[in-house]
Every structure is written in structure tokens, then in C-alpha cells.
């Protein structure tokens, strides 16, 4: 019984580690989810990255908090 408890603890720790690593990944593109959304929702939902300069510079997507690939700000890229 103790063996199962230890395995369960290891699984929980592994899941927590993967989720913590996933927080860093959110800063970059998550194309699987974002491409499934309508364009306007995709722009609003993706606060940390954009697929290309055209999308970053579009009126819908050019929020000050939004950063483009390589962490360029939209203002810097679109200027």
C-alpha cells in the first residue's frame, strides 16, 4: 500500500513540474489552441506572442502588452 502512495506522490509532483514548465511556454506560441479560435479571439487571448508581424501590427492585436516573436514589442516592430 505504501508503494502505491509513493507512486501517487511522484505522479502529482511530475504533473506539478510539467504545469510549472508550461507557464514559461505560455509566453510563446501555442498554435494548437490558438489556430482553433476565431481570429479576433485568438488575438485577444494571445497576450504574450504573435505569429507574424502582420498579425502583431493589426488593429485587433496591437495591444501594448502584446509582444511579438523574440519579445519585440508591437510598437517597436510596427514603427
Curated annotation (Swiss-Prot):
Gene Ontology molecular function, alphabetical: ion channel regulator activity; toxin activity
Tissue and organ distribution: Expressed by the venom gland.
Localization: Secreted
GO cellular component terms, semicolon-separated: extracellular region
Disulfide topology: 43-57, 50-61, 56-78, 68-74
Keyword Signal attached: yes
Protein family (similarity comment): Belongs to the neurotoxin 13 (insecticidal toxin ABC) family. ICK-21 subfamily.
Record keywords, A-Z: Disulfide bond, Glycoprotein, Ion channel impairing toxin, Knottin, Secreted, Signal, Toxin
Domains (record comment): The presence of a 'disulfide through disulfide knot' structurally defines this protein as a knottin.
Function: Ion channel inhibitor.
List of glycosylated residues: 71
Keyword presence, Glycoprotein: yes
Identification of the protein by name: Toxin ICK-21
Signal peptide residues on this chain, from the entry's feature table: 1-20
Amino acid at each position: 500500500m505504501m508503494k502505491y502512495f509513493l507512486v501517487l506522490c511522484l505522479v502529482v509532483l511530475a504533473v506539478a513540474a510539467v504545469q510549472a514548465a508550461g507557464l514559461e511556454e505560455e509566453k510563446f506560441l501555442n498554435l494548437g489552441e490558438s489556430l482553433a479560435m476565431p481570429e479576433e479571439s485568438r488575438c485577444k487571448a494571445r497576450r504574450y506572442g504573435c505569429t507574424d508581424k502582420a498579425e502583431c501590427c493589426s488593429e485587433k492585436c496591437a495591444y501594448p502588452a502584446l509582444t511579438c516573436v523574440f519579445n519585440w514589442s508591437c510598437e517597436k516592430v510596427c514603427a
